């Protein structure tokens, strides 16, 4: 790679009903057509296998437990419809609405709920500034809780999002 990095290709196959082997073949073909080359992946191997997300679930489960123990994630049993109703309330301008925090517990609260049957959201630190430079669009500064909010990290069907 031009910047000295390595591109590791992983196949997001967590939505089993919509994942088929022919889609993986098409992904390789499309990426090569765009001139993309990867250092390791499902078709060539490498030291960071496995390259199918579904075969890395134990790694994701361990990360989930670390986040849960640190009080950085919380369970949310709101349906999409519940969230959409809350977001339909008037809000400033045409900005993207932010999750209203309906299920958000007090900061640092550690949930003992299981992963199954409930969505889990990552708690952002409101007011924290995130600055980065987009190679195409230039410098950006985003403020947690204002420009973006808590986000889904684990789905109620027991898969990472």
Predicted regions located by residue number:
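Active-site cores that bind ATP or allylic diphosphates and position pyrophosphate for catalysis
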Residues: 80-161
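N-terminal Rossmann-like or analogous alpha/beta NTP/dinucleotide-binding catalytic cores
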Residues: 1-92
């Amino acid at each position: 790679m031009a910047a000295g990095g390595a591109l590791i290709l992983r196949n997001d196959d967590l939505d089993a009903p919509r994942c088929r082997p022919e889609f993986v073949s098409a992904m390789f073909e499309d990426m090569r057509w765009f001139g993309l080359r990867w250092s390791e992946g499902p078709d060539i191997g490498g030291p960071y296998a496995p390259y199918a997300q579904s075969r890395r679930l134990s790694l994701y489960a361990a990360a989930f437990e670390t986040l849960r123990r640190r009080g950085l994630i919380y369970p949310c049993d709101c349906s999409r419809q519940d969230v959409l109703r809350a977001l339909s309330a008037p809000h400033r301008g045409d900005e993207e609405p932010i999750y209203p925090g309906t299920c958000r517990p007090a900061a640092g609260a550690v949930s003992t709920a299981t992963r199954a049957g409930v969505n889990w959201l990552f708690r952002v630190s409101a007011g924290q500034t995130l600055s980065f430079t987009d190679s195409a669009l230039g410098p950006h500064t985003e403020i947690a809780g204002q420009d973006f909010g808590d986000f889904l990290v684990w789905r109620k069907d027991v898969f990472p999002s």
